[in-house]
Structure formats: structure tokens, C-alpha cells
Amino acid sequence: MTHPGPEVKMIYRGKPSEGRAKIAIINAGQVDLEFLQPIGENSSWKDYLDTEGEGVQHIAFRVEDTAKATEFFKQLGMGVVHQGRFDNDDGSYTYIDSREQLLVNVELLHDDPKK
């Protein structure tokens, strides 16, 4: 389960959020299947469930440079809708609002360098 609080620095539509979700990840070789159940308010997960119902909410890509990837999508008219830090603070996630163009959000995952 994701954890709320300032340590995860969750931002939804430009404002701090306490949104949470239960998460299960199944590793299937080079593909990870992530199942989310929103249990809090103000997140792209809850927004998708409320407007679209159950289904594929995002496709995730690991990136080395989140700012560069975010700028790429911004140039295509797609902005950041939801972002934060991993619960163990070793990386970040950024959701791009690409539902109008791609029917799903794009999630950018960044792992911090190992210390």
C-alpha cells in the first residue's frame, strides 16, 4: 500500500495530495503488471476509476531523466497530472496526462542512483 504524508511528496494537479492506493505487482519477465486499488482521494488513480471505471490506467516507462521526458510530453501538449516519490524514497514517479491522446496515462519511473 502506498503511504501518505510529506515524505512521499505526492502532488496531484499541482497541489499536495494524500491520495493512496493498494498495489500488487506481478513480474512477468520484462513486463510488470501493476494492479491498483485507489483508497484515498485526489490521485490520478481515483480520477481514472471515477471517470472510466476499471481498466488500464497507465503504461509505465523507466527513464534516466524525468525532466527531459516530461518536457518531451509537454511539447506534445501533455502535462504532469500526478507525481511523487516512492515510499522507500529511492526514486520517483510522474504521471503524464495523456488520456486524450493515448487513452491511458503515461507513467515515468526514475530510480535514484544507488548510494
What feature does the model see in each segment?
Residues Q30, Q101-L103:
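Glycine-centered tight beta-turn/hairpin loop motif at sheet-sheet or coil-to-beta transitions
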Residues N42, G55-K68, K74-V80:
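Surface-exposed interaction/gating patches
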Residues H3-P4, P38-G40, E64:
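Histidine- and/or cysteine-centered catalytic micro-motif in compact active-site loops
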Residues W45:
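Zn2+-dependent peptidoglycan hydrolase active-site motif and core
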Residues E34-P38, A60, E71-F72, D97, ...:
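A structural feature that tracks compact, well-ordered secondary-structure segments
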Residues R20-V31, Y48-D65:
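Vicinal oxygen chelate
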Residues M1-G29, K68-D97:
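Core segments of cupin and vicinal oxygen chelate
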Residues K114-K115:
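Basic/polar N-terminal segments that are highly enriched at the extreme N-terminus
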